[in-house]
């Protein structure tokens, strides 16, 4: 108490967690290890905004962004960016990009109604495609949803699909191979091919995913929940094996780990090597294959990518059995993609190097065999 003061000083510190819990009793699921920064939004009085003069927090956060950008950081992944007012990003990101034009900003935004706001007003380069493509592919891989849902998923983005970041694992989500997801990393291969190859946008791989990391350790706080802990000091089995005591030669990996890694390596390499994936147009074939007599729209998904005289015919199979499918290629696909119609095309499966003959005609189905939990990327040049 200040000397001579009539009343003792009573302090009433702000009690706010990062997830907007405004009391002193957060529960175990609240972000009690975080604090809420003051970006100029009065959350306790209707969320009113006070952005003039520029909040001091904005200035400090811009300084932090510029500091790390000056150290050579090539991008920022902004956790739960939608919990920070879009006005801040609108103000800060252009200033960082003015000094560092090549830097990327990726936002974790889970509300589709806010996607365009954070892309076009907030100036983010990419947004997490979690509640759309990730959730859909996970449900399809687990048998809870039809593969036809993938079409509705990309259509719902209505033109911003190139600005979405695709992924199948991240620090928040359960591992594909865990008992809480697919229980087998091979079941994620069709989803990998779709997620990586259906558009020109980026694909994120979470460490250990390429080896089929189980995420089934019983860590301290995190517990056995199918995730790799972000709360405990821990190490990851497949990464330890890959490191091999600092040799980084992968010799401790199992043959199953190595096989899966080779698939991931091949698919991701194709994303950069194949111009049809990196720059080409996309055509979804599913609408022409509903209720197909030799095509299960619930277990298979098929589409095309094309650039100039190169065509990729991509088919994936989420089923546990090898399938012989007959795929209808509609006349509109030939017109839109400008594909010459031919009875016999020599095609190369870019995943295996195997060659096969296929027909591409609007009145005759294209016959292809696809293995269980697998896919084909057939390349045709004309």
Which residue stretches match the model-derived regions?
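C-terminal beta-strand-rich structural cap/linker in extracellular carbohydrate-active enzymes
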Residues: 358-382
